[in-house]
């Protein structure tokens, strides 16, 4: 299932043995047929007439596409252990022997040929008919209903049965009556005169109900076709009593044919509940995939928790006294949310009254419901009010304010405006799905990563409080050579001047202009050519639909997403009406996301302007989809090098909080056996020397000692030369390594002097992420030491965690999941949780500061004076919290448990560009946050 099929894979004549008639039919297939078959997908080339893309049946009426195939390992893990007749398999042992791979591959070209013949005879259903069909059963069953692919629901509505069909039987038995081919080739008996309950029709014919099985036929041999089943498709081609004979007559020779049946059980149940099954499966497919088999229990527990989303109107019609007329949309339909909905008048009164009294809009309120505190966030636009209510114990108020902003941003990106999203009836199922995911992520964050280890689940849940609401994307720093290779691959794609993407190929204007792209690997952003606003819009969309965690665990075999989007950066009116400012073209914008394994490539396209104008609701063009796939395939060899970067030592170095709870002797020993410092050769010898036996915890002399010269400078003028007396710069190697080098004699001094000469060539601090050619000049031993970078001064590393946000480029850096996994203990996970929650509160203070500074700038008359006022009054904001913690499982009654103190400090930089830094370090550190910030941000570029 994870195999990638492309619509430009035209089989050669060598791949079609024993079929000389194919060349004659090629001549009969004229250009007019090709154009009509291509439809709105604008592929007039015959290369795309051989095989329809596998995602084509999943394109919706409005042109949107959300197609997800799981990886093979993921499908096997989700399938039930005991085989059933309706599990997701495309072949069974009775039909195709699994060990006989070559025999199975022999028939694959004939499947392509079969599709091509059906296309030429115009038996393939038209795309417009597929989109406009209101039938509950989709054409490509397994692709439309992803819950069947995951294997979560055992009893499935549709099943695929592979049977062996031999048209040579027709030479013995001549088909003279209608539907005889169905009996002769397949062994299925259908009585057209029987009175059978019809729940729907496909085409103009009657549904093919299985009334009997021919003894010895292929259907009976399979053991999977039952009386009462309905044959709905042959090789994903809709079949009814009208076209079944023509479809079967197109089979070129002996081959395996896939028959898609609707189960008899569901046919009978459909009459009493025709829509309920379809709605439930569509709205929770992705939820089931993300949260696993426990999704029903999770959703049930979530329904018992008070939470609600309401979109209300403030303009009521006094003439009509319709009940709940002010509610335009609300979710969910649960008893707990019903209580919140019943007090909506309070929210409307607060919104109107406080704005009239204070002149400012209300942002949040809190209320007690059955003894439980509920936070409610407000968002007012014109005469509409959006409310989101969540329990205070699950979602703190600062996070809820950020969450409602993210919801607004995502909905505007998807629909253009809130009214377009909430005021259209056809969007209600999509919004239900949207907020189903939203509340699951808010109330059950740990369950999202059910396949991960408990420590990883805990970190993901605790970090999501802060990281999911930052205006940026998680950035992974890579070596320069890898970065250049990624940039070249994306640049080639964005140029779009080759093959079918070139305007000269068809001698017509191209369909879309590629505005930019961004590449993710295992959930990390590794390369981006998008403006900051577009990057954040796309990242928030992917984050909401949990696409990044899926790619991180390689649960994606193939992912294709296509939809029209409304990036506010391009659509908002210009504040400056000057003619010199570049005006955005009046075009439409589309988002294409293609994922393969760990990779996910997001492409923003523009229709209009330099490209052709989009008419109606265009679906994805297979040429662009294939080019994006090709770009990802070109990066197959890069993933191993990126994995090496993820598996390497943390840069910068981190320490575990539990190491600081022990005594001096135990503390020194724990440092030598830590997974970080153990990579340094000879560390154990240094640790046992008397000069290094010093108590880190409780040694308050560390607080009063002067900082090293290299760390006292806030700029880059003399930051590198300050460590000349120490041999190594303190921020690049531990002091223990420096002492080891000095004890090695003259050879060590000579090597140290050589390194010093190299570093003194530059007058700036060494970049901790891109060491450049300096690494190449070092021997292997020196390279191992040099790669271990720490940001704090002193003999020991006291940095526990950090988050650095670069708002101009829309990225942030923080320790990777692999780096955090190396640090475990009794109090370190709690430290990480406290860090993210504390940073959330600190950032709320920073956001309020930015609002006040912005108001000051607007109130001042001259623009230049406003800039001076901002920079002169509060150029830097800093806020910190001191924590003390001790192990909770302390059993020694004679001794008091050790206590460790650590700081969580946040700093806001307004100039020269907005930046935010949050660090967690031991109380004994002498660094100030601005020094760490300089080292973190130095050289951090896309």
Curated annotation (Swiss-Prot):
Q: Where is the composition biased (Acidic residues)?
A: 22-31
Name of a matching Pfam family: Intu_longin_1
The record, for SMART domains, names:
PDZ
Lineage, top-rank taxon, reads Eukaryota
Q: What is the effect of changing residue 500 to A?
A: In SRTD20; uncertain significance; impairs recruitment of IFT43 to the basal body, but no effect on subcellular location, when tested in a heterologous system; no effect on the assembly of the CPLANE complex
SUPFAM superfamilies xrefs: PDZ domain-like (SSF50156)
> What GO MF annotations does this protein's record show?
phosphatidylinositol binding
InterPro entries tied to this protein: CCZ1/INTU/HSP4_longin_1, CCZ1/INTU/HSP4_longin_3, CCZ1/INTU_longin_2, INTU, PDZ, PDZ_sf
Query: What UniProt keywords are attached to this protein's entry?
Result: Cell projection, Ciliopathy, Cilium biogenesis/degradation, Cytoplasm, Cytoskeleton, Developmental protein, Disease variant, Phosphoprotein
Its subcellular locations are: Cytoplasm; Cell surface; Cytoplasm, Cytoskeleton, Cilium basal body; Cytoplasm, Cytoskeleton, Microtubule organizing center, Centrosome, Centriole
Q: How does this protein assemble?
A: Component of the CPLANE (ciliogenesis and planar polarity effectors) complex, composed of INTU, FUZ and WDPCP. Interacts with CPLANE1. Interacts with NPHP4 and DAAM1; INTU is mediating the interaction between NPHP4 and DAAM1.
What's this protein's name? Protein inturned
Q: Which gene encodes it?
A: INTU
């Amino acid at each position: 299932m994870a195999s990638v099929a492309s619509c430009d894979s035209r089989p050669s004549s060598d791949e079609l043995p024993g079929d000389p008639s194919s060349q004659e039919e090629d001549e009969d297939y004229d250009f007019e047929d090709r154009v009509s078959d291509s439809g709105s997908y604008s592929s007039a080339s015959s290369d795309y007439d051989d095989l329809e893309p596998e995602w084509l049946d999943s394109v919706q009426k409005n042109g949107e596409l959300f197609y997800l195939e799981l990886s093979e390992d993921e499908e096997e893990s989700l399938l039930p252990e005991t085989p059933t007749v309706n599990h997701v398999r495309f072949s069974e042992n009775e039909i195709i022997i699994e060990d006989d791979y070559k025999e199975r591959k022999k028939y694959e070209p004939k499947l392509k040929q079969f599709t091509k013949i059906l296309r030429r005879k115009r038996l393939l259903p038209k795309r417009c008919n597929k989109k406009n069909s209101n039938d509950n059963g989709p054409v490509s069953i397994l692709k439309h209903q992803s819950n069947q692919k995951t294997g979560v629901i055992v009893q499935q509505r549709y099943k695929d049965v592979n049977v062996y069909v031999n048209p040579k039987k027709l030479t013995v038995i001549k088909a003279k009556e209608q539907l005889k081919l169905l009996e002769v080739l397949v062994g299925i008996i259908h009585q057209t005169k029987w009175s059978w309950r019809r729940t729907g029709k496909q085409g103009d014919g009657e549904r093919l109900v299985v009334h009997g099985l021919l003894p010895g036929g292929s259907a009976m041999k399979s053991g999977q076709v039952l009386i009462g089943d309905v044959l709905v498709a042959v090789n994903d081609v809709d079949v009814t009593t009208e076209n079944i004979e023509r479809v079967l007559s197109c089979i070129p020779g002996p081959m395996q044919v896939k028959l898609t049946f609707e189960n008899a059980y569901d046919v009978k149940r459909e009459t009493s509940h025709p829509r309920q099954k379809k709605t439930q499966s569509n709205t929770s497919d992705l939820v089931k995939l993300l949260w696993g088999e426990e999704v029903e229990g999770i959703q049930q527990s979530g329904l018992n928790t008070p939470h609600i989303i309401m979109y209300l109107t403030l303009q009521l019609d006094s003439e009509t006294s319709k009940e709940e007329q002010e509610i335009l949309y609300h979710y969910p339909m649960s008893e707990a949310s019903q209580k919140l909905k019943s007090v909506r008048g309070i929210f409307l009164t607060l919104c109107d009254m406080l704005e009239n009294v204070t002149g400012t809009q209300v942002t949040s309120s809190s209320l007690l419901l059955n003894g439980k505190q509920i936070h409610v966030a407000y968002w007012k636009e014109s005469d509409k009010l959006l409310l989101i209510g969540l329990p205070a114990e699950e979602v703190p108020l600062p996070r809820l304010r950020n969450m409602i902003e993210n919801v607004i941003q995502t909905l505007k990106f998807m629909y253009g405006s809130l009214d377009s999203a909430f005021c259209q009836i056809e969007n209600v199922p999509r919004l239900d799905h949207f907020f189903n995911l939203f509340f699951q992520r808010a109330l059950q964050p740990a369950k999202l990563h059910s396949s991960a280890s408990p420590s990883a689940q805990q970190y993901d849940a605790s970090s999501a409080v802060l990281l999911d609401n930052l205006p940026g994307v998680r950035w992974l720093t890579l070596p320069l050579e890898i970065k250049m290779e990624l940039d070249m691959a994306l640049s080639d794609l964005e140029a779009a001047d080759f093959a079918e993407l070139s305007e000269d190929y068809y001698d017509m204007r191209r369909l879309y202009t590629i505005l930019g792209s961004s590449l993710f690997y295992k959930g990390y952003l590794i390369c981006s050519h998008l403006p900051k606003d577009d990057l954040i819009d796309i990242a928030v969309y992917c984050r909401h639909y949990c696409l990044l965690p899926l790619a991180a665990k390689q649960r994606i075999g193939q992912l294709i997403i296509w939809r029209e989007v409304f990036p506010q950066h391009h659509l908002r009116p210009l504040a400056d009406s000057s003619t010199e400012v570049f005006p955005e073209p009046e075009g439409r914008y589309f988002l294409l996301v293609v994922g393969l394994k760990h990779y996910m490539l997001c492409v923003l396209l523009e229709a209009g302007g330099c490209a052709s104008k989009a008419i109606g609701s265009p679906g994805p063009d297979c040429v662009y989809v294939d080019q994006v796939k090709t770009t990802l395939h070109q990066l197959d060899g890069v993933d191993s090098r990126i994995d090496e970067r993820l598996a390497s030592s943390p840069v910068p170095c981190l320490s575990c909080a539990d190491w600081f709870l022990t005594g001096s002797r135990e503390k020194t020993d724990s440092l030598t056996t830590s997974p970080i410092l153990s990579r340094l050769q000879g560390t154990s010898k240094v640790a046992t020397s008397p000069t290094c036996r010093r108590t880190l915890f409780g040694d308050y002399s560390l607080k009063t000692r002067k900082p090293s010269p290299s760390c006292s400078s806030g700029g880059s003028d003399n930051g590198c030369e300050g460590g000349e007396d120490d041999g190594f710069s303190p921020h690049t190697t531990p002091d223990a390594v420096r002492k080891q080098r000095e004890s090695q004699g003259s050879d060590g001094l000579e090597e140290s002097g050589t390194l010093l000469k190299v570093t003194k060539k530059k007058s700036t601090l060494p970049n901790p992420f891109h060491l450049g050619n300096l690494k190449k000049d070092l021997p292997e031993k020196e390279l191992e030491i040099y790669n271990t970078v720490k940001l704090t001064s002193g003999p020991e590393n006291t940095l526990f965690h950090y988050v650095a946000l670069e708002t101009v480029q829309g990225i942030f850096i923080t320790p990777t999941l692999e780096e955090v996994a190396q640090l475990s203990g009794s109090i370190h996970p709690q430290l990480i949780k406290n860090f993210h929650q504390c940073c959330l509160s600190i950032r709320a203070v920073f956001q309020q500061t930015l609002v006040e500074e912005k108001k000051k700038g607007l109130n001042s008359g001259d623009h230049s004076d406003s800039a001076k006022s901002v920079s002169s009054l509060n150029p830097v904001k800093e806020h910190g919290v001191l924590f003390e913690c001790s192990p909770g499982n302390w059993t020694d009654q004679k001794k008091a448990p050790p206590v460790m103190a650590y700081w969580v400090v946040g700093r806001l930089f307004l100039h020269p560009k907005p930046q935010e830094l949050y660090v967690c370090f031991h109380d004994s550190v002498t660094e100030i946050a601005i020094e760490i910030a300089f080292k973190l941000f130095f050289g951090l570029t896309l």
